[in-house]
Amino acid sequence: MAPTLLTEEQRKELIPKDWEMVVGRDAIKKTFTFKDFNQAFSFMTRVALVAEQMNHHPEWFNVYNRVEITLATHDCSGLSVNDTKMADIMNQFFNQLHQ
């Protein structure tokens, strides 16, 4: 079953508060900053493994200790529950690295 766009109520409930809407696009974004490149790459590796399992891949950009991520679902041309799940997983991985 193809993913569907989030309703306004779902958006308010499911989009993590620390993620921002992308201007001019139905997508969310966040920049994660790490101690160093190794920590950033470790985060990206963990996310990549989950993304492959979910068949839901982020758009991302990495320079040294910073990873900029944008999430949207191409199959429905906007935000779906897959994006909010992925955002929650990324936040969890980030928090685990900073305990």
UniProtKB/Swiss-Prot annotation:
Protein name: Pterin-4-alpha-carbinolamine dehydratase
Entry's family note: Belongs to the pterin-4-alpha-carbinolamine dehydratase family.
Function noted in UniProt: Involved in tetrahydrobiopterin biosynthesis.
UniProt lineage: Eukaryota, Amoebozoa, Evosea, Eumycetozoa, Dictyostelia
Source organism of this protein record: Dictyostelium discoideum (Social amoeba)
Paired cysteines (S-S): none
InterPro entries in alphabetical order: PCD_sf, Pterin_deHydtase
PANTHER family given in the database record: PTERIN-4-ALPHA-CARBINOLAMINE DEHYDRATASE
EC number: 4.2.1.96
